[in-house]
Amino acid sequence: MTWGMHTKDTPGKGRVLVVDDEENVRKLVRVSLTKAGYDVEEAENGEEAERIIQAQDNPLMVDVILCDIRMPKVNGIEAITFFQKQYPSVPIVVITGFPDTEMAVNLLKQGVMDYVPKPIDGAKLLDIVSKAMAKRGSLKG
């Protein structure tokens, strides 16, 4: 897949990077978002996500990041910290099977846009991604 920010000359609603160690979750998110018109890239963990992003020619090739918290290798907290430092204008939405209110509040205070517990509600996911895309659009200038 070729990455690059969407413009009025490129098709689709935007590009989403899904970072989750559970293949079934990545598939569910990919299918839901693809049907809604988004381009989706997947990573199994934070380490792979960092590699994907750093390998791209354009450092702002992704519009929204959906990231699990508990993953092997580089976990979600570490990945989120990396994303926020390197790409502060890219909205991050946390997805996790361990809903912890205190953790969610702390992540929101640290600049994460939203928090979606698993199992993921497809309609809620689309609503949150749409809001994140709108936020991303306002941050692009």
Feature annotation, model-predicted:
Residues 57-66:
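Active-site beta3 strand of CheY-like receiver
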Residues 71:
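Receiver (REC) domain active-site loop signature in two-component systems and cognate sites
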Residues 27-35:
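Charged docking surfaces used in two-component/phosphorelay signaling
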Residues 51, 77-89, 106:
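Short amphipathic alpha-helix used as the core "switch/output" element in two-component signaling
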